[in-house]
C-alpha cells in the first residue's frame, strides 16, 4: 500500500490523504467518512480511489482518534465541511512540510453507517457534487435498539469510553444529542435533500441499521437505493470496489 500523507485542518482535524496516481484535466476529490465505533482502516480504499485519479482525504472526526476536540460537540458532517473549506488553500503534509497545490473542481463524499449520515448531510452543501452512503444511519430513532445490539451496558457512552479509551472523547451529554431527533440526523432534513446527489447501498439483513428505515428514507426523498437481499452490515470498501463502475457513472 502507498504511504499516506497526514495533514491537519482547522488546527484540530487530522486527516490522511493521497494525491491521485495520475493527473487528469479536473482535480477531483473524494472525502471518506468513517463509521463509529470503528478503527481507522480505510487506507486500502484510499489507495484504490487514488489509482482511479482522485485526491483522497480520510479525516478523523473532532474528538475521535488523532483529531483534537470532543466527539459530537458539533455535528460530524460539519467537520467534513471544514475540510472542504480548507482544500483550496493547498495542503501541507505534517512529516516534512511538503506542500500540495489543490483547487478542487469536483468534490465527492463517501460514508458508511455512522459516516453515511455525514455523507448525506454533506450533500446539502452546494460544493459537494455527489455522495455515496453505504448502509447509512438516516434516522437516529434506531439508536436505542442499536445500542442494545452492541453492549449490555445501559450507558452506551460509558461503554465507548471503556472499550475505546481516548479513541473517542465522548461525554454522556454529547451522546444524548443523537436521541433528540435533529442533531446529525438526515431524517430531519428530508425536505432539503437533492435526490440526484445521493446514491445509497443497503442489505435487507443488516443487523445494525434496519433496512426498513433506509427504504423509508429513499421513498420519502427519491434517493436511489441499491438493495441486496443478503450481506449484513456491508463493508464500504467492498461496495466501492465491487460497484465502482456504477459509482463512477453516478459521479459523472
Where are these regions (language model features)?
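N-terminal cap/lid segment of alpha/beta-hydrolase-fold proteins
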Residues: 1-25
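Catalytic histidine-centered segment of alpha/beta-hydrolase-like enzymes
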Residues: 231-242
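Hydrolase active-site cap/lid region
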Residues: 121-173
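Conserved alpha/beta-hydrolase
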Residues: 49-68
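Alpha/beta-hydrolase active-site loop
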Residues: 71-101
Amino acid at each position: 500500500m502507498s504511504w499516506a500523507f497526514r495533514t491537519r485542518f482547522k488546527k484540530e482535524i487530522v486527516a490522511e490523504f493521497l494525491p491521485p496516481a495520475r493527473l487528469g484535466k479536473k482535480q477531483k476529490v473524494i472525502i471518506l467518512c468513517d463509521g463509529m465505533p470503528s478503527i481507522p482502516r480505510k487506507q486500502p480504499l484510499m489507495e484504490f480511489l487514488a489509482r482511479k485519479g482522485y485526491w483522497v482525504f480520510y479525516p478523523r472526526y473532532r474528538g475521535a482518534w488523532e483529531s483534537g476536540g470532543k466527539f459530537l460537540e458539533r455535528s460530524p458532517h460539519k467537520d467534513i465541511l471544514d475540510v472542504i473549506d480548507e482544500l483550496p488553500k493547498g495542503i501541507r503534509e505534517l512529516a516534512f512540510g511538503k506542500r500540495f497545490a489543490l483547487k478542487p473542481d469536483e468534490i465527492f463524499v463517501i460514508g458508511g453507517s455512522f459516516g453515511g449520515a455525514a455523507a448525506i448531510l454533506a450533500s446539502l452543501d452546494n460544493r459537494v457534487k455527489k455522495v455515496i452512503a453505504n448502509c447509512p444511519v438516516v434516522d437516529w430513532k434506531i439508536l436505542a435498539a442499536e445500542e442494545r445490539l452492541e453492549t449490555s451496558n445501559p450507558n452506551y457512552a460509558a461503554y465507548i469510553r471503556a472499550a475505546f479509551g481516548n479513541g473517542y472523547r465522548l461525554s454522556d451529554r454529547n451522546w444524548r444529542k443523537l436521541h433528540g431527533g435533529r442533531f446529525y440526523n438526515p431524517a430531519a432534513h428530508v425536505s432539503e435533500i437533492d435526490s440526484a446527489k445521493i446514491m445509497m447501498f443497503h442489505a435487507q439483513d443488516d443487523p445494525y441499521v434496519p433496512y426498513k428505515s433506509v427504504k423509508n428514507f429513499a421513498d420519502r426523498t427519491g434517493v436511489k437505493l441499491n438493495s441486496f437481499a443478503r450481506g449484513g452490515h456491508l463493508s464500504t470498501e467492498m461496495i466501492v470496489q465491487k460497484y465502482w463502475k456504477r459509482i463512477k457513472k453516478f459521479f459523472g
